[in-house]
Amino acid sequence: VEIPRPVIEVMDRLEKAGFQAYLVGGSVRDMLLGREPKDYDIATDATPDQVKPLFPKVIPAGEKYGTVTVLNGIPIEVTTFRKDGRYLDGRRPESVDFSDSLEEDVKRRDFTINALAMTKEGVLKDPLDVQRDIWLEHIHCVGDPNERFNEDALRMMRAIRFACQLGFSISAPTYYAIRRNARLISNVSWERIRDELAKILLSERPCMGISLLGTSRLMQYIIPELSDCVGFDQHSEHHDKNVMAHIIETVGWTPNRLNVRLAALLHDVAKPKTFTLVDGEGHFYGHHLEGEIMAREILNRLRFDNHTIGAVCTLVREHMSRYEFLRPRNVKRFINRVGIDNLNDLFDLQIADIKASAPPHDFGMVLALKEDCQRILNEKEPLTVKDLAINGHDLCEWGMTPGKEMGAILKKMLECVLEDPGVNTREGLKKVFEGGFQ
């Protein structure tokens, strides 16, 4: 993977002005691995005040920490070499001292895979002699991992995220430092934890991520509600795995969409709470309803947006719906209950749930329900009051006084239409009205 021309131009202009300029961080790592970098960072001995006059378009956000963003076709972060002071808030250093040394700069980075640099000609610079970790596929802290995690506890989740994204293993010293320091994640804002969790779930190896969050003890501080699921025997012929193992495998079978993967992670969170044992057979009556309540608490705590919370909680609540024998009218109610936008996520969750259960795997009821829903949507059959051929004005014309009862009448008419779509005309609904809804 070559360095893009806009990045080379910025590096070249810095060098012509007498400054050092190196591509650093994740972009170098990704290029060495043959991956297309998502963004590009340049490190230099030039201060922000020296960088800004060199380029026509510069965003000064981050200037306090030595960073400005140069706009040259693409946004490129340019940061002054620096040495960090003590970290007092578990996120940012108390002070930032600018430096003129690339080696000093890379010493402050989190992991060795992010501590490499490259010239504009593509020559690799490795002041700490750590490039072997790229080829060994290791996630390893720069220096003492305990110090790195005390500086910023989110780095523990980042280590797991990089392992999931790159398919690397976490080195033993780094992994055991995560276990020792897991409690420190409680000092990190929920918003930052949420963002890392989402990246782990959307990686190519979400199962690895959830497993590592568990074994490293981080999960008990992030989603402690899942702790009871670990090793929980389901005592069921339908399940050949404990609850947490089933959850992890379900996540692995879902497509790479955040809502469905969050729902997979939380769909059985209430099983330990609702467990009963009758004649040696385990039952989890109402776990989908209790799970919806628990999922809402978890997602609110993690500061997910209301739309995501609503969608995921719907998926958790409805993940057992395939077991219902639904008449056409009830299929339409099901569509209304789930929401058209959530249907595909729900069916993907249900299929993943079955795949993660004990064989044989029967997808018949899920696929039949999916087919019924698709037919109803394709035929544009009425589903809500808004789809009725009449509205409140028509009811007024037919002699009804405006008020709360009007909404109730429209809902009753919708019930008739759900049963028989053919009645959804102005004339047909007027007959229904005259037949008993005055």
Question: How would you label these PLM feature ranges?
Answer:
Residues V1-Q438:
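Catalytic cores of the polymerase beta-like nucleotidyltransferase superfamily
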